[in-house]
């Protein structure tokens, strides 16, 4: 974000720096004595303020901890309790971060907002604004931005999207911030910096561990394989950390919160041919034609799978041309036309290949 601000400043924009405070470290991980890390630590605030002072533009801290906690963190907890796997970064970008930035931009009479995300904003000849992948495919973040509405995209500038990460690091060095160029990237959830989301849930939900401990692991025939530590502490596709020895690799294929049950199977049991997606936000077009082809990504690092899209109720039915593995309800499905984002939504449920369905219900 600092490099994005300096790039725009160099191009002649009148820049106002904003650093967002989204969460309280101590409230999330407790007083562990560990150094505060992640996007909201004191060092990141100081780095941003130093750059602003040195280049002569104002800098403010925007405290959105209350809004972030009320929506993003609560949604994170509720989704796991519902047996789904949330994506808090998508929720934050869609519902909190951009809206808060735009509100402050309006108060400061700013025309645009800008962030350090690796993606591009373009306008189609139909007048609609849409996202395009950043040219550095290894750093592209368009997947996490699918929820941005037209009024936000029309006033968003993403200057890093047409550069590779190594070029941005070189720019940071050229701007006089060699330490910024050397900074390691943070991949953990900002409010779970120790990457222990299970511990986070236990701290936030009183009595959760006692309430869900001792449910059954079962296979796809319903046979009980053992007991688990509680369904919210597992995700579809998980293999490691199951704490059960079956003498063969086992994967979480389904989570049933109503009965505190976790279904285990072989890797092939993760294959899915269809999924239902709701909460759709269209970007490039204002909708789809029935059977429209798209490359659908089901997770951030996913390369995407060719699919056809069909409307159903108030959502989209995605039919994959080949089986896809590890589709997790609660995650985002993002539809691409080449490098362009058509739209996206939240995965509700999946359909297994017919052969597996037949086996399950005979």
Question: Predicted segments — roles?
Answer:
Residues 34, 114-121, 125-362:
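AMP-forming adenylation/ATP pyrophosphatase catalytic core
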């Amino acid at each position: 974000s600092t490099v994005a601000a300096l790039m725009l400043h160099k191009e002649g924009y009148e820049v106002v720096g904003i650093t967002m405070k989204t969460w309280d470290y101590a409230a999330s991980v407790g007083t562990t004595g560990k150094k505060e890390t992640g996007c909201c630590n004191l060092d990141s605030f100081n780095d941003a303020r130093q750059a602003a002072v040195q280049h002569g533009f104002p800098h403010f801290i925007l405290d959105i901890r209350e809004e972030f906690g009320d929506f993003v963190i609560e949604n994170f907890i509720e989704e796991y309790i519902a047996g789904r796997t949330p994506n808090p970064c998508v929720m934050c970008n869609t519902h909190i971060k951009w809206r808060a930035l735009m509100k402050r931009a309006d108060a400061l009479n700013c025309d645009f907002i800008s962030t350090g995300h690796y993606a591009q904003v373009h306008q189609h000849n139909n007048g609609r604004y849409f996202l395009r992948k950043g040219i550095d495919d290894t750093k592209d973040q368009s997947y996490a931005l699918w929820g941005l509405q037209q009024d936000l995209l029309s006033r968003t500038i993403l200057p890093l999207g047409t550069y590779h990460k190594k070029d941005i690091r070189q720019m940071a060095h050229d701007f006089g911030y060699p330490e910024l160029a050397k900074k390691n990237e943070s991949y953990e959830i900002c409010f779970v910096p120790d990457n222990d989301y299970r511990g986070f849930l236990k701290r936030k939900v009183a009595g959760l561990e006692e309430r869900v401990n001792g449910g059954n692991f079962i296979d796809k025939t319903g046979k009980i394989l053992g007991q688990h530590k509680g369904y919210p502490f597992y995700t579809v596709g998980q293999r490691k950390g199951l704490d059960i020895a079956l003498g063969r690799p086992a994967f979480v294929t389904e989570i049933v919160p109503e009965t505190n049950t976790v279904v285990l199977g072989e890797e092939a049991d993760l294959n899915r041919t269809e999924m239902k997606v709701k909460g759709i936000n269209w970007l490039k077009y204002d909708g789809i034609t029935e059977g429209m082809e798209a490359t659908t990504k089901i997770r951030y690092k996913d390369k995407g799978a060719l699919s056809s899209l069909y409307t159903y109720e108030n959502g989209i039915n995605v039919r994959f041309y080949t089986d896809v593995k590890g589709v997790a309800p609660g995650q985002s499905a993002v539809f691409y036309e080449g490098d362009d984002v058509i739209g996206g939504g939240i995965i509700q449920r999946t359909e297994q290949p017919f052969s597996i369905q037949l086996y399950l219900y005979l």
